[in-house]
Structures are given as C-alpha cells and as structure tokens.
C-alpha cells in the first residue's frame, strides 16, 4: 500500500457565522454565532458541495467559487447525502432528532432530486409495509445500486431501483448502523456501528459484498471502543477509509475521550495510516471533491472544513 503523504489541514471555510483560525488545530476556535449543525456532505461534478444543516432544517449549497446559499428549505431532517453518477442528489430524510426541547415529526424516506430541474422522487419509505425509523447515510456501487442505513431502525437496505428494496442487514446482527461505504472493486462493504450505550458496538464492520448485493463474512475492521465511534466516512481510490470519529468533550454517554476528534485514515487491512485532527466537536461526516478529487470536505459542529489529500477519493 502506498504510504499516505502528510495531509495538510487547509483553511477552514467561514460558514454560517463561524470563524476558525487557519493555523494548528490546537488554536482556539472563535464562534461568532451558533445556528447550525452540519452533516452529510456530498460533492457534485462541478465542484458544488451540498451539506445538511440540521438545526434549521436546510440543505446548503456551496459553489466552487465559494458562494453559499440554501438549496432546500424544510429538508425533512435530511442527513446523509450523495450525488449519483447522473448528477442527482440522494438524501436520507427523517433522521432522528435528539435536540432538547424540540419535538418535530419527520417522514423517514430516501429521496432523489434532479439538480437541474428540482424534481424530487421518493425512492423508498418503507420495508414490507413498515415505515423506516431514521435513515442516516447512503453510498452507491458501480452498478448504481444504493445502500443506506436506518440507524434507529437497526437495519441496512439496498435500493435496486424505485420501490425495489431489499434488507441486507438487521438487528440483532447489527446495533446502530451509521456511515456506510463500498470498496473501489465493489467486493467489500464497510459499516460504522455507533452505539454510545454501555458496552455498545463502536466500530467499523467489514463484509464481503457479493455480486447480487448481499453481504457475508462479517469481521471487525477497526474498533473505536471505548471512545466515540465514527459517524460517516468516505473512501479513496486505493481503498483507504476516511472515518470522521471521536470527541473532545464528554456528552453524557458511556463514550470516553480515548478517540480524539478527527479523520481516521484506515487501510484496507484495518490499520490506522494517519490521523487528521479537526478542532471542533462534534465531527460528523466527510466527502471527496475538487477537480482532482483530492479535497476532503469535513463537517464538524457548525463548520465545513476542507483538507488536501495525496490520494484521490471516490464519489461514493
């Protein structure tokens, strides 16, 4: 495996009134306002970054020129996003909300939006008549099949087409499935377990991914326990995972501070190759973009960061 060169933490973008210093991650972060919680970045072929802003219920849009705007209001608590090869935005909607004092009802569903026309279609909203609970994150294989997690529902599904749905993993074999990725050769599926309960699974699981879209031969790829597990992840052309994990302050769970906040670069063999510190809790997800696919966009707290990498990423 080619050794990863030193990643450089680039200047953090100033988004939604949050200012982050451009030097070392240890510097104090100045927060001008607190109005956002960023999640689920996805990058279009033209360099536009889409990400969810879960407190205000919006999907945001940042152009390659740095112009920030709202792509969609009332996002139905959208979380994980993906831009498919046809340039359509896939969204995991209706994700669970745990914000104190806020009680809202969302419709759990997977949608697909044409970025040119704005037309939105519902790809799936139930399995065998039972509604989803909290769709969280999504990825895609080379055949165009979508795989998504239902974190609170404890399941992983595959979408072969509109209303063509299969459940490939479920409790008790998995607990709280979060981020999901597929290897460049479509032979491995990676799944983040993010269970903050005492003794809960906090790891990346690896499975053999068969040609028919089913999985088997589960093994622990990387274990974050007893710290905070990863939330979301992306993958590069050499099969290395970039997992957004950890925390720098306790949040009332059994999770410890053993896992520091940052991006964990993990080889196909499950070895930690590099750690990229991110100076803000809570880190959530990341996605590759840029003309050479060597810019990693990272969502954490109220901020969208970007990091240059040596190896190009995949748009998954």
Language-model segment annotations:
Residues 1-6:
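N-terminal secretory signal peptides that target proteins for export/translocation
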Residues 10-20:
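Bacterial N-terminal signal peptides
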Residues 25-316:
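Sequence-structural signature of mature extracellular/luminal beta-sheet repeat domains
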Residues 7-9, 24:
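Hydrophobic alpha-helical segments, especially transmembrane helices
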């Amino acid at each position: 495996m080619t050794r990863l060169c030193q990643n450089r933490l680039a200047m953090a973008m100033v988004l939604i009134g949050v200012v982050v210093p451009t030097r070392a991650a240890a510097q104090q972060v100045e927060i001008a306002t607190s109005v956002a919680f960023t999640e689920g970045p996805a990058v279009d072929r033209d360099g536009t970054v889409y990400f969810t802003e879960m407190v205000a219920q919006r999907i945001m849009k940042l152009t390659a020129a740095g112009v920030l705007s709202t792509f969609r209001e009332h996002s139905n608590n959208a979380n994980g996003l993906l831009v498919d090869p046809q340039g359509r935005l896939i969204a995991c909607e209706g994700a669970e909300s745990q914000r104190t004092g806020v009680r809202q009802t969302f419709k759990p569903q997977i949608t697909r939006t044409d970025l040119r026309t704005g037309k939105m279609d519902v790809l799936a909203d139930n399995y065998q008549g039972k509604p989803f609970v909290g769709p969280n994150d999504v990825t895609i294989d080379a055949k165009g099949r979508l795989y998504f997690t239902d974190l609170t529902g404890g399941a992983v599904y595959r979408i072969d087409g509109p209303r063509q749905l299969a459940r490939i993993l479920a409790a008790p074999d998995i607990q709280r499935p979060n981020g999901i990725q597929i290897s460049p050769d479509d032979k491995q599926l990676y799944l983040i377990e993010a269970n903050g309960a005492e003794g809960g699974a906090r790891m990346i699981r690896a499975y053999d991914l068969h040609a028919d879209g089913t999985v088997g031969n589960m093994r622990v790829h990387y274990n974050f326990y007893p710290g905070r597990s990863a939330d979301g992840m992306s993958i590069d052309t050499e099969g290395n995972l970039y997992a957004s994990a950890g925390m720098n302050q306790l949040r009332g769970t059994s999770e410890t501070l053993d896992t520091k906040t940052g991006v964990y670069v993990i080889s196909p063999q499950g070895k930690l190759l590099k750690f990229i510190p991110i100076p803000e809790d809570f880190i959530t997800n990341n996605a590759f973009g840029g003309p050479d696919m060597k810019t990693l966009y990272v969502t954490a707290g109220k901020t969208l960061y970007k990091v240059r990498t040596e190896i190009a990423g995949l748009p998954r």
